[in-house]
């Protein structure tokens, strides 16, 4: 004996027992109800149910479902900033605009492109999607970001394991023009280590020309925010000290490119260097 739900007037339903062949619940329930259920699934499950049949695939392929799952599972957005530091840290942000502007389709497309270029890498685990909130902690800067980092690295006066004094003096109070989403690689690009900055710029430019359109060398504040966000949310030290890894940034201080990384248990390093080494490569970042 099986239970079947038949839709009647409005949003009310009646139930009846019968001995006939079981019906697919997708064919019985209204699309709105199925989509509500599917909205609680993770990315892996959404991908799996697309293979059940055409009806399931039609509903599971709704862009809003993937957007919700990516926001919840992949993105480090205002909700995660608030979870880590309290709601006041993003109290002046527009959360509706934040979600509507989430580049979920671009994230999926770039993951596929990244996989085609670097087949040895897991694409989903190679890109981080981070919200750079202009008003974060009163205004996103290297200094205010460091104040947040002190919650995790209390032994540091700045929130960083080390940040060069001239960087604080020249860039410490600089912010961003607007709140925005960015995609950044979780590691330096293959083949970018121990190269001059000019060579690293060309590596990123060639990548952008081939497939990953609009990717560029990251700036110091962007790099530090993205790298620290992954630690705040998941306790993961990207661009770490094992093996020691830095990304070069666009910014110059005292004539030298800033590098960010060497993320040790004591915190992140933001320094500047005038030489090429195997531990200095370059990441790639895309703004939205």
Would you name each region that the model predicts?
Residues 4-74:
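Skp1-binding F-box subdomain of Cullin-RING ligase substrate receptors
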Residues 71-216, 221-288:
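A binding-site-centric feature that preferentially detects glycan-recognition modules on secreted/surface proteins
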